[in-house]
Regions:
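Extracytoplasmic gating/loop element in the C-terminal half of outer-membrane beta-barrel translocons
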Residues: 141-233, 238
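Transmembrane beta-barrel architecture of outer-membrane proteins
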Residues: 5-11, 32-38, 117-121, 140-142, ...
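Repeated loop/turn-to-beta-strand initiation elements of outer-membrane beta-barrel proteins
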Residues: 23-24, 131-135, 221-222
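Conserved small-residue
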Residues: 2-7, 18-115
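C-terminal beta-signal and terminal closure region of outer-membrane beta-barrel proteins
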Residues: 3-8, 50-75, 168, 176-178, ...
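Extracellular/periplasm-exposed beta-strand and loop segments of Gram-negative cell-envelope proteins
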Residues: 1-6, 43, 55, 108-114, ...
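Membrane-embedded beta-strand positions of outer-membrane beta-barrel proteins
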Residues: 13-15, 28-30, 136, 234-236, ...
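Transmembrane beta-strands of outer-membrane beta-barrel pores
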Residues: 17-19, 32-38, 129-131, 140-144, ...
Length: 272
């Protein structure tokens, strides 16, 4: 028997304004949409209310709540909470025991974020003066999250090392008060550290200068009535020119598929 009920809501909008002052024309358009989803009824049997998906986002991001690092063997020995992911060593991640059973396992996963953006949108700007036209497009998204769980960030076993390991935990770094941005390195599977948790979560908020184009239209008067060419337009444009984001490198790198690329085009449109 299939049992379930969910709701998806959102708002789309588009606003524009155009005006002309002498030889100068301009236009601006803003557009966007909001996105929300919720599980209204779910057939589930869970031990604790925090584990319920009913009443939560459909695209909720579930994971462990990280409390930092274990910085010594003494901390590990004195901690009543044990990991079900194998032997824990200094430099490993420490998680919150949500249900108080002194074991870190799948029952300790909670909602730590959401996969999809709450809002996506953008803006178009067109400026025209005599024969020149400048067009620019900004796009953006806000309110979503993702996990750094690709091979660039999850380095263990025989995987190739990336520059993220430069911030790996070591005893000397800890004692010297140096910045630590990565768990200890291991030649094993690292099951404890490489789980979906808020330690690896990042915001996918971004603003992109998606496209800019400059166009010049040659005057029709340059072409006679009997000319083969009736009109000529030349242009230069660029795509994916700029990304503003806290995790710009992570998103542009796009590990596992083609990285984000920038392109430039010079062209002409001929009317016969």
């Amino acid at each position: 028997i299939n049992y379930g009920k969910n709701r998806r809501t959102g708002v789309d909008f588009s606003l524009g304004y155009n005006d002309k002052v002498g030889d100068f024309e301009y236009g601006i358009q803003a557009f966007g949409q909001t996105n929300s989803s919720k599980n209204l009824k779910v057939a589930e049997n869970v031990e604790n209310d925090y584990m319920r998906t009913e009443g939560r986002l459909i695209d909720a991001l579930w994971g462990y709540e990280c409390l930092g690092y274990y910085n010594s063997q003494e901390e590990i020995d004195n901690d009543k909470v044990k990991s079900s992911f194998g032997t824990v060593k200094p430099g490993d991640l420490r998680y919150k025991d949500q249900n108080g059973d002194n074991v870190i396992d799948s029952k300790d996963r909670v909602v730590i974020g959401r996969w999809s953006a709450k809002f996506t949108g953008g803006m178009n700007l067109t400026l025209k003066y005599k024969n020149f036209t400048l067009f620019a497009m900004l796009t953006g998204q806000f309110g979503g999250n993702a996990i750094k769980n690709d091979t660039y960030n999850w380095v263990y076993g025989e995987r190739k090392y990336s520059d993220v390991v430069l911030g790996a935990w070591t005893e000397n770094k800890y004692k010297n008060g140096e910045s630590i941005t990565y768990p200890r390195l291991t030649t094993q599977s690292g099951d404890n550290n490489f789980n979906t948790s808020d330690y690896w979560m990042y915001s996918t908020d971004r603003i992109d200068l998606s496209r800019v184009q400059l166009t010049y239209d040659f005057s029709k008067s340059l072409f006679g009535d009997n000319a083969l060419v009736k009109g000529l337009q030349v242009y230069v444009n660029g795509s994916s020119l700029l990304t503003i984001a806290g995790e710009r490198k992570q998103m542009e790198r796009n590990v596992g598929s083609a990285p984000q690329t920038r392109s430039f085009t010079i062209g002409a449109k001929v009317e016969f």
